[in-house]
Design a protein with these regions (language model features):
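Juxtamembrane/disordered regions of integral membrane proteins
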Residues: 2-180
Length: 180
């Protein structure tokens, strides 16, 4: 398969661009990772998991009396913004603190750890029980509502976001000869 772009390897060209433009790369990574993962979360019932329709849940929280369309559009906007903000936080703060090794595998591991452990736990421990289902007593990750499948789905969703984020936000080492 020919993956050449302008005489350079397309994957390497992307990594050079990411390294030279960390903020722009984080924004793009957040947009793309967020959209892909959000679609997969909505399609989770296809593999026997509960749907994670974060845009609808977010929109219903923002405007509980709005129509389905208003809730979805508002939720998609704010959920998409969340995905971008968390990608920026990852790229600018967490990524540099998680070690100096910047191989594709290590970059992927960093993103998966960040998204699954930190973001997944925030979602399961706080957002789902105290924001999206406030007052229903559903417990950690909705364990009293959807059982283990809902908790698993929350962590699976965040792992998928991390995989997408790590695949896209994949810089080179700052001393890489390609950067000169």
């Amino acid at each position: 398969m020919n993956n050449q772009l302008g005489g350079l390897n397309a994957g390497r060209s992307w990594r050079i661009w990411v390294t030279k433009h960390p903020i722009g790369a984080a924004v793009w990574a957040g947009v793309i990772a967020g959209q892909l993962t959000t679609l997969w979360g909505i399609w989770f019932p296809g593999v026997g998991l509960p749907a994670l329709d974060w845009p609808q849940a977010t929109g219903a929280t923002i405007d509980a009396k709005g129509s389905f369309v208003v809730q979805f559009v508002m939720g998609e906007f704010f959920h998409g913004l969340d995905c971008i903000i968390f990608a920026l936080l990852f790229a600018l703060f967490f990524f540099p603190m998680m070690g100096k090794v910047v191989t594709p595998a290590m970059n992927m591991a960093k993103a998966c750890i960040f998204s699954t452990i930190l973001l997944g736990t925030i979602s399961a421990a706080f957002l789902v029980p105290y924001i999206y289902f406030k007052g229903f007593g559903i417990g950690f990750g909705g364990i009293h509502y959807g059982g283990w499948k809902l908790v698993f789905a929350i962590y699976a969703w965040h792992l998928l976001y991390g995989v997408n984020l790590g695949a896209l936000y994949n810089p080179l080492a700052l001393d890489d000869p390609a950067l000169t």
